[in-house]
Amino acid sequence: MKLITAIVRPEKLEAIREGLEAYGVQGLTVSAARGYGRQRGYTEVYRGAEYNVDLLPKIRVEVLATNEQADDILDVIIASSNTGRAGDGKVWTMDVSEAVRVRTGERGVAAI
């Protein structure tokens, strides 16, 4: 099993969710994140004072997948979140040794 994690622009969440739903993903976790990559941040002037905004708002999307589904899900997330501009985000996968559905006690792929 794989845990696919994406840190992407907040405005891309709906496109990602729709793409994953169309692929057949039944669940995902979304949380707020802040950070920067190559684009760093920006300077904003508010009421005459300069402010450095160096941690930009992002979202973190996590999906558990079978090994067979992982590459396809990765492709769906990339296609749904790509704008071609700096700040589009990152996507990575990690091996998961065990998953358990708390309600039923199902383990492994059955818990996904």
Descriptions of predicted regions:
Residues M1-I112:
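Positively charged, small/polar-rich N-terminal and surface patches that mediate targeting and assembly
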